[in-house]
Structures are given as structure tokens and as C-alpha cells.
């Protein structure tokens, strides 16, 4: 194996492929990154990683002078490529080692037994395409509410529901719930699919595939690729594909938790509310709520109690309906506010002890944007 490749293209592709490598692999070869030249007659360079859960494959242009394959430490190769000077990179296999030359810098890497490396799973059949920037933004909003407790694996995922030309992303950790909708171009107009995808992998993948205009989503309900979801995008003059195993289990039926009517609807400047919550929550003890009192044209935030430190701040708000006082975990509240992209946030309530629904709006008078909704459970207030 021998090839010559642009330094930036190689460094970017290696970093992308190595990002999902396990920190403590169950088998040593799973820490490796597979480097192949001209696989299946493609004429280029292919970098692959796989840990039996998530696979990554990057194809990139290169001047190949000898075909072959080698398995080297993925993290080490990523560190080396990141530090190389801005000159063409030459890599070749010399016996049991891989030689890497860039300018006057020379590295020799020990290879791992390539024959022990598992075969990567095939991509399921393409289901449709979505704008890459829109998809990355939507996923970033949805994963905010995903659980992080591996004892409840179902809640660490994002449920993707596909109906025709619409994709819904749902996530919950039992204390908050996110729902994001976006349009896409399905391969079949009657597409109706659902999948539970690990939130961390989905967020990382969506964010890493924004170089090209579109991302292809590949999801199979049966046959080849069943139990997998695949994503494909373009970057660095080549193609990047990733697959991940779907989570098992039944995602809770959460759509009905969004109420259809509200007794109080408040609108507040998002930036002002974020700053106020950050200030007031400085005195809130661990796991205690920040109180929010909505009345007429004012929102008053309070935190702290008794002989401990206390804080209070009032900001302007447009409040329609009954006055209401409730409280929320300040970090969960900030997570939702930060995820909303609009300048104004709408908070809608049925009663103080029930969840609030948050959404964005372009102005105090504009229609709420319900493409993204964030439902947040209240916390019991300290008397």
C-alpha cells in the first residue's frame, strides 16, 4: 500500500472516522483505523472504524501508487495528522509498519492484525434526503431532552418518526420532553418508519455531515440492514457514511403530553430571561427550583430560602390569562431556552403543577413556531 494525499483532507477524514473509537475497546483491534487504497476498484482512499455498534467510513481522493490495506491505532493517527505541517502526506506499508512522511516529519506506526478486524455492516437502502444544516440544527435541539442514564437505555435515544415528507424527532428523560419537526425528501411519498437512535451518536453524526448540501438517511424495517440506521454526506471531496445499531425497547408515547389548551401564555425576550435565570440561580441550592411568578406585564424570578442566600429579579413579559406561580430546575430551563432559536420565548401553562410548553416566536406578536416544542416538568417550590 502506498499513496499521497492532501494533509488537510487526510487530517479531517481521520479525525472524523476516529471520533467514535471506543476508549476501552473489548478487543484491541477495535481501537484501530482501517486504511485501504482502491477497495473494490474505487481508485481512492478509504478510512474505516467499527466497534460493533457504530461504523464510520470516509472515502477521499488520493494518488494511489500501490494497493493494499493496513490497520493502525486510530487515535494515534488522528493526533499525528492533526500536528503535521501543511504539506502533502505520503503513507506506505513497510513490513509490519506503516510509514508516514510529511515534509521533513517522519513517523513509523506499528500495524495491528488486519485479518482480525470485523467487516463493516452494509448501509441499509436509502430512505430519503434532508438538508444537512437543517438536520444538524434540528437534532441539536431534540437531543437536549435525551436521558443520560444508561440504566434506562430507551431514554438515551431520540425517536425518529417518518411520515411522508415530514420527520419528527422526540426525546425525553422523564423530566422534560423535546419535539422537533422538519421536512425532507423521501424516496417514497408514503414512507412511514420509526427508529430509536442513540442520542449521542445522532448528535455527533448530524453535526459532522454539514459540509455537503444534503444528508441521506438510510433505514430498513426488514431484510438487509435491519436494526441499523445509516447516514451519508459529502466532505473533503469524498463521501462519509456512518451506521449505528438502533436501541431496543419501546419509547414512551409522549405526544399526548402536549396540552391542546392553556390558561396562561407568557412571552419574554429570550436573551433577558436567560441572563436573569443565570443570575438568580446562583443562590439556588442543588436540586432546588427557581420560582417564576407571571402577572400582568411582569415575570419575577426568585431563588433561595430561609436563612440562606436569596435572589430576586423582575423582567418585562407579555402575560395573557391567569396569573401563575411555578418553579423549574434552572439547568433544565436554560437547556430549553438555549435550544430555542427565536428571539422571543413563549411559555404556556395549564396550571402551576403541570408541565409548561416552551416554543419560540419571532416577536411578542408573531405566531409561535411549533416546529420545536420543549415541555418541562415543574419542581416543587420550597416554602
Give a label for each model feature.
Residues 1-383:
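Structural preference for solvent-exposed beta-strand-turn elements
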